[in-house]
Amino acid sequence: MTAPVLIESLDQEGRGVAHAEGKVIFIEGALPGEVVTYNAYRRKPSFELAQVGQILKPAFSRVTPECHHFGICGGCSMQHMDVRTQVAAKQRVLEDNLKHIGKVAPELVLPAVYGSPWGYRYRARLSVRYVAKKGGVLVGFHEKRSSFIADMQACRIMPPRISALIMPLRKLVESLSIRERLPQIEVSLGEDVDVLVLRILEPLTAQDETLLKAFADQHHVQLFLQTGGPQTAYPFYPEDAPELSYTLPEFDVTIPFHPTEFTQVNPMVNRILVRRALNLLDPRRGERIADLFCGLGNFTLPVARRGAQVVGYEGSAALVSRARQNSQRNGLAGSTRFMEANLFEIDESWMREQGDFDKMLIDPPREGAVAVVTALEEKQLKPWRIVYVSCNPATLARDASVLVHRNGYALKAAGVINMFPHTAHVESIALFEKARRQA
């Protein structure tokens, strides 16, 4: 057993940080202010990675995890701390990245956006494996630091009706002839239908099909089958199920989607995120606004509903087609355009060809949008306002540095969106502005 150490802070993965014998110790399951022992599982000359041992002095922010799989399952890493402490830690991660990577600081720290900490996950990719030693099939997330699948009976971060399906799914897969050739089940929930996408590597037998249909009827789900990449997923049973979609009621927008297309995992927080983004962007009638990495139109359509003319750019031809369909579905085709573009390779000449935009919204994947912000260098004073939605604080900070130090913008505000409670994932939003040309 190690000597007790004092936990000084949390790192970006939510691990407690301590110092001992000239090394930095990163301790999973430890909280700032606690005195703990630890069990190292990786030792390097300057640091160690460890699991918490005994908690000799607990922090006031420590709570009892509600899921008995916590600590083994890799789906969550922060259930041992109260939600406000989780969010405060994420806010520090955001501000530290902006300071140390971007050399910037927001003029205003926005209040954090919260949602329900339980039952929030409407999208999940569950691994499946037949394990003879376990006596059957496992369905769930991977164990921490492991390729093994956690032996899960339930999942508190998924809606109760889906959590309750884990054991029936295990029994279902075990009964199939292809139980060793079904590696993944993707969960995709809409407002009127719950979809499970089964990744299959061999054809089903007639008996398999009968078992799957009986499961779908009993548990009121629609089953898709996926034989290759995401684009190969197709409805298996029932084929006449309701359309998979989500709504943004504040903007009278309904967005249909395919179960393998990207949507936010947390629909309630997504509604709040869209509201905040539009409040910061403040679209006005007559303005021309760009929505980069627009996807299905999650932001594009609400912005258009406010009266602006919006051009959405997306790298996937399939998503561009879907976004156009969604704009027509919502009666917004006249105020929106959607264009395919590889936004990781654009430059200043491409940006000039698009014409002037009054404002811009950027919602990139984890890689960020460095090509976009670099291409804005020659745009003079337009767009004068940019709202940047980020799922990676490091790339946000890098891009913020370009916008502020090279392009003349000010970082007016930034804050976290707690899209993934109980995980270290940091979703955030930032507002950039530059002085407008005077008439």
From Swiss-Prot:
Catalytic reaction equation(s): uridine(1939) in 23S rRNA + S-adenosyl-L-methionine = 5-methyluridine(1939) in 23S rRNA + S-adenosyl-L-homocysteine + H(+)
Domain TRAM: 1-54
Active site per database record: C391 (nucleophile)
Residue positions binding [4Fe-4S] cluster: C67, C73, C76, C155
Residues reported to bind S-adenosyl-L-methionine: Q264, F293, N298, E314, N342, D363
Keywords: 4Fe-4S, Iron, Iron-sulfur, Metal-binding, Methyltransferase, rRNA processing, S-adenosyl-L-methionine, Transferase
GO biological process: rRNA base methylation
PROSITE patterns linked to this entry: SAM_MT_RNA_M5U, TRAM, TRMA_1, TRMA_2
Residues that span the membrane, as ranges: none
Enzyme Commission designation: 2.1.1.190
Any one Gene Ontology molecular-function term assigned to this protein's record: iron ion binding
Keyword Magnesium: no
Functional description taken from the UniProt entry: Catalyzes the formation of 5-methyl-uridine at position 1939 (m5U1939) in 23S rRNA.
Protein family according to the UniProt entry: Belongs to the class I-like SAM-binding methyltransferase superfamily. RNA M5U methyltransferase family. RlmD subfamily.
Protein name, as recorded: 23S rRNA (uracil(1939)-C(5))-methyltransferase RlmD
